Amino acid sequence: MVTEAFEFVAVPFNSDGWGPPDASDVSSSASPTSVAAANLLPNVPFASFSRSDKLGRVADWTRNLSNPSARPNTGSKSDPSAVFDFSAFAIDEGFGLASSGGNPDEDAAFRLVDGKPPPRPKFGPKWRFNPHHNRNQLPQRRDEEVEAKKRDAEKERARRDRLYNNNRNNIHHQRREAAAFKSSVDIQPEWNMLEQIPFSTFSKLSYTVQEPEDLLLCGGLEYYNRLFDRITPKNERRLERFKNRNFFKVTTSDDPVIRRLAKEDKATVFATDAILAALMCAPRSVYSWDIVIQRVGNKLFFDKRDGSQLDLLSVHETSQEPLPESKDDINSAHSLGVEAAYINQNFSQQVLVRDGKKETFDEANPFANEGEEIASVAYRYRRWKLDDNMHLVARCELQSVADLNNQRSFLTLNALNEFDPKYSGVDWRQKLETQRGAVLATELKNNGNKLAKWTAQALLANADMMKIGFVSRVHPRDHFNHVILSVLGYKPKDFAGQINLNTSNMWGIVKSIVDLCMKLSEGKYVLVKDPSKPQVRIYEVPPDAFENDYVEEPLPEDEQVQPTEENTEGAEASVAATKETEEKKADDAQA
């Protein structure tokens, strides 16, 4: 096998610097070094570079020249240095150097694009994204897309939160309505609906009454024990039980004093403070309630049924948190109402000075038998003038008396009860001593109707002070044992201003209902608060309705008689006429 000998060429030495010597310098020398320098490829350029530049290929031995005529004239058809020629041909798109036919003017129009990513900030959110997604896009464009996606994600998250909150509120609203959907009285098939009045009409009413006249004061009052004003959650007091004392919840028409006053023709309208307070605060109510109305001659009696909802005290009526619907649950609306009534009775007797001293009045308790132990209560029969030919007499209750500034002052005693802090969100044992305002604000939100009715009753009775106790369970699951945590006192007029209870609006509601009922014929009627809508309805019922031998057969809601448009318009027209009469009287008084 014959092989060609491999000839080693001499490596030229450059005495002037690094790298091969310039070929132009070796023209006359005949040394091997000069000969090797003369054989160097003349068209291999030198390009300066930095470490941040991308490196391309040194030579491309597989490239076919697409435009051979553009090759510079080197005097040889097959120039071995063509593969190294960077100036005449674009070797690769990755180099960033190209020539358009070797024209220097066109080459000057090209600009290198900075491919370096922008410097990352040392602080700020570290958003994660796929580095291999859209690799061909520039880094600036990629950052803009990341910001746009971030904004879209924020909008989507806000939209989901908004929908979640709306659905959550709707669920609570539906559950709240479902818990209070049952009517306080079963609507019978033979009942005839006469009027339907929305609460929005009540809010526009206003009527000013003159100072009432005291007709009679019955019963006896014990003095308030001021030591209970010093009670705090740290020195709580156990709530006692007063089983031997009798409490009376007598309706209007069964009151012997009211019967006597009606016989003496002292007034045309008769009611109790609890019934009037229910009417005055009707727009704040959520649960269903009912009032029996009897028209006898030219007189009107507002009564309550035996075992009526008015005998109980609502708990968490105006709260957004739903209560258990099961009647057997200790935290259901009915169970809490019974518990609240029991707490109020015991609280009103425990905070008294039990030394036998009692303030007596004109007559004894009209409902007590001789020798019977009765609770401390006084009944104040007062008369208001509603019109020139119309007066209203109401029986108002007071629970205690005290000497304030050497003057006799009448008090009303009521108690708020805490059953489970998780429902209200405020633990009384932790907040009562340091944040009483927050506790009271929470109670106004959850029990606004009950507090408004207590205030209305205190105003009707002309009480000098309202005492409100804060009573809590010993344990959230123990509804028999309770403790008194604190007692606060308020003036009724000042407290009415705090809870936005307008006296003129209260009497405007009563006046409109009385005017509407005085237009009815003699008979028995019932006014029912709708269980699911903010409105009241007036039904005509048989004379034997709500008697002991009267059997009630509930009628489904969809089969109940609905009011005609004429009746609805008639009720609104009556209310509007009452409002016009009030405005005319006000103008005459100013004139």
From Swiss-Prot:
Biased composition, class Acidic residues, residue ranges: 549-560
Which GO annotations describe the biological process of this protein? Answer: cap-dependent translational initiation; formation of cytoplasmic translation initiation complex
Please note every region of biased composition (Basic and acidic residues). 140-159, 579-591
Pfam families, alphabetized: eIF-3_zeta
What highest taxon heads this organism's lineage?
Answer: Eukaryota
One of the record's GO molecular function terms: translation initiation factor activity
Location in the cell reads:
Cytoplasm
Q: Which InterPro entries match?
A: eIF3d (IPR007783)
Q: Which UniProt keywords apply?
A: Cytoplasm, Initiation factor, Protein biosynthesis, RNA-binding
Q: Which residues form the signal peptide?
A: none
- Give the start-end ranges of region RNA gate: 309-323
Q: Region Disordered: list its residue ranges.
A: 100-159, 549-591
Keyword RNA-binding set for record? yes
Q: Which GO terms describe its cellular component?
A: cytosol; eukaryotic 43S preinitiation complex; eukaryotic 48S preinitiation complex; eukaryotic translation initiation factor 3 complex
Q: Where is the composition biased (Basic residues)?
A: 123-135
**What family does the Swiss-Prot or TrEMBL record give for this protein?**
Belongs to the eIF-3 subunit D family.
The function of this protein is: mRNA cap-binding component of the eukaryotic translation initiation factor 3 (eIF-3) complex, which is involved in protein synthesis of a specialized repertoire of mRNAs and, together with other initiation factors, stimulates binding of mRNA and methionyl-tRNAi to the 40S ribosome. The eIF-3 complex specifically targets and initiates translation of a subset of mRNAs involved in cell proliferation. In the eIF-3 complex, eif3d specifically recognizes and binds the 7-methylguanosine cap of a subset of mRNAs.
Q: What is known of its domains?
A: The RNA gate region regulates mRNA cap recognition to prevent promiscuous mRNA-binding before assembly of eif3d into the full eukaryotic translation initiation factor 3 (eIF-3) complex.
Instruction: Describe its assembly.
Output: Component of the eukaryotic translation initiation factor 3 (eIF-3) complex, which is composed of at least 13 different subunits.
HAMAP family, per database record: eIF3d
What name is this protein filed under? Eukaryotic translation initiation factor 3 subunit D
Species annotation: Arabidopsis thaliana (Mouse-ear cress)
Taxonomic lineage of the native organism: Eukaryota, Viridiplantae, Streptophyta, Embryophyta, Tracheophyta
